């Protein structure tokens, strides 16, 4: 899989030099007055009704210039940590179907006061209706939103269709475009590149490297991690930033 992706990257690297875009993709990070945006001190997470914790004794700090990736085997609690952080910052349940009984059993999870978060969910099943209604609910400029989707190679013909008819890759592009256009202190992305084509991945990489927003993300693409990340948080062993 990785070999195929690397081959596609090599074949398409020249395209970024040759294609004249209407406008560069832009992200609009906000600058928080606090240096530390998130700090976990020896936290353990547990779901209500479960005898075993999701994970134990996790510590890390995320500052304004950090782009940290969560690492660990499937089921170790990466997405659960993102949900706990969102709830701690006052964002409630980020997507439908989440277990509301997740709680911090031990330790403390700090989020900076007034922290504004832009969240890209792993789940796309809640996307319904048309783009106009989606933009209205999210407070997004529809013209700018559609321009970003075009830059991510979503065909204009899709703009008039209901999003539940979109492919998984097209739905991901909707969430990424919304995430990009939402000004925030911290960008939380949960497996954003699932089903995303290589050319769009390269554009997203360049976007992050240009604007360097603070990020906490889960992503299995090692090349993407190494290109845009500043560190890692390993979950499953008394974790720390590396």
What do the predicted segments below correspond to?
Residues 1-50, 63:
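Coupling and communication elements adjacent to P-loop NTPase active sites across diverse families
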Residues 32-242:
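ABC ATP-binding cassette signature C-motif
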């Amino acid at each position: 899989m990785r070999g195929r992706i690397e081959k596609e990257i090599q074949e398409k690297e020249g395209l970024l030099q040759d294609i004249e875009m209407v406008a560069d993709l832009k992200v609009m990070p906000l600058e928080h007055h606090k240096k530390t945006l998130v700090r976990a001190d020896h936290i353990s997470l547990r779901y209500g009704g479960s005898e075993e914790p999701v994970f134990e004794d996790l510590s890390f700090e995320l500052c304004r210039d950090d782009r940290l990736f969560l690492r660990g085997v499937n089921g170790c609690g990466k997405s659960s940590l993102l949900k706990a952080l969102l709830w701690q910052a006052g964002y409630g349940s980020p997507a439908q179907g989440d277990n509301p009984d997740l709680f911090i059993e031990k330790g403390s999870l700090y989020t900076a006061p007034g922290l504004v978060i832009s969240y890209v969910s792993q789940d796309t099943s809640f996307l319904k209706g048309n783009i106009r209604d989606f933009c209205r609910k999210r407070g997004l400029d529809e013209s700018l939103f559609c321009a970003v989707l075009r830059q991510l190679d979503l065909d204009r013909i899709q703009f008039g269709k209901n999003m539940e008819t979109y492919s998984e890759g097209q739905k991901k592009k909707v969430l990424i475009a919304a995430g990009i256009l939402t000004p925030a202190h911290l960008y939380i992305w949960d497996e954003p590149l699932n089903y995303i084509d290589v050319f769009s991945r390269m554009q997203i990489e360049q976007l992050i490297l240009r604007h360097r927003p603070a990020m906490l993300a889960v992503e299995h693409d090692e090349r993407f991690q190494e290109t845009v990340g500043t560190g890692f948080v390993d979950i499953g062993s008394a974790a720390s930033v590396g």
